[in-house]
Amino acid sequence: MGHKIYTQLMNGVSHMLPFVVGGGILIAIAFLIDGLMVDMNALDVAERANFGTITPAAAMFKQIGDVAFGFMLPVLAGFIAMAIGDRPALALGFVGGMMAHSGTSGFLGALVAGFAAGYIILGLRKVCEKLPEALEKIAPVLIYPVVGILIMGLLMLFVVEPIIGGINTALNNGLTSMGSSSKIILGLILGGMMAIDMGGPFNKAAYVFGTAAIAAGNYDIMAAVMVGGMVPPCAIALATLLFKDRFTKEERESGPTNFIMGLAFITEGAI
């Protein structure tokens, strides 16, 4: 059972990674361009909030990268769902993933949506088996998408978003209340949150808090966030070089890619 869930999860992750890598590196280039071209000390608080889109070249890279990143959660949820319920589940997963992306449940919400979408289709199949043959034939093109997307949407709106979104909001509020406390303790917590779930709710909460600190002119908090986010992919890449016998040939070949992703601050590369 555990291996089956892992296989379904990795089907989503493997399809998601190209969007993460492409979008993440383009966004990193946008920040690099602004970092080289703009004097941060000359900007006011409102202008600092736009860091990464200040110069036209940076804004272009950021726009393209953001679009690619926007597909991350729908693709993750869609292909997890497809691994469970085959092609009819893909649409449900995409809808659930997009609702997680546009809402507050984020990465964890997309994971729940992917698995839920797959099992919704399995349930609908059992129900449709009892229908007259004429109705059963139109189920894949009519009943599965209409009823399935409706159930998926209601589940996201009334269960996943309130619960998981509430957890994410509580995390952000907790970090905000620590803003005036010891910066060393705050840095340790944020760095650990960035590294612990590699793109999940803890990671995203820490990143949002770090970007908010930049907008307020506090750069040292984001430094801790970035170091924590770079550790997992860089550590895995280093491990593939130092302990080659512990990894498969395919994993060893992906090691250098993880170095690049780590230096580009793409924590999800460790997945």
Locate each region found by the language model.
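Pore-lining transmembrane helices
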Residues: 1-133, 137-271
